[in-house]
């Protein structure tokens, strides 16, 4: 997260609004705190996250391919002979409790991309790590991580 937070801090607010709009990222509202993406004003659904991953893969965004590849490299969790596994977790914390966990990603295998998003919502222990663990169990059952 520190990597993406540092990039975020280096971008002017006007430019950031333009990027968020270009991505059509959720409700596009970054008016909240400096951590607008973490239990604040910016909201996005699991379906919207998956659609964004698909747009990135299908080069439907006006961003330089080198930047797209840099982001994909930064979220690559595993490269194996048979597949490439990309993903990003997130955990929303309210009053010290993990109330919102998510994990989104892609498996690239045999020339195809498989997109997924897992979202957990609860009073406590709804972390990105738990969402990732659930996702990986499902992906393994589907034999996509072999």
Regions found by a protein language model. Give the residues of each.
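Mid-domain, small-residue-enriched loop/turn segments at the edges of structured enzyme/sensor domains
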Residues: 4-58
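Structured C-terminal helix/loop/strand segments within mature extracytoplasmic catalytic/sensor domains
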Residues: 9-12, 54-146
């Amino acid at each position: 997260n520190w990597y993406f937070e540092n990039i975020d801090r280096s971008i002017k607010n006007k430019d950031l609004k333009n990027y968020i709009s270009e991505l059509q990222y959720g409700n596009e509202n970054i008016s909240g705190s400096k951590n607008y993406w973490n239990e604040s004003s910016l909201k996005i659904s699991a379906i919207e996250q998956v659609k964004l991953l698909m747009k990135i893969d299908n080069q439907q965004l006006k961003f330089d391919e080198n930047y797209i590849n840099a982001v994909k490299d930064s979220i690559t969790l595993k490269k194996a002979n048979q597949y490439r596994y990309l993903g990003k977790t997130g955990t929303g914390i309210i009053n010290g409790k993990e109330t919102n966990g998510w994990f989104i990603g892609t498996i690239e295998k045999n020339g195809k991309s498989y997109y997924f998003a897992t979202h957990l919502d609860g009073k406590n222990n709804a972390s990105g790590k738990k969402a990732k663990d659930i996702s990986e169990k499902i992906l393994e059952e589907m034999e996509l991580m072999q």
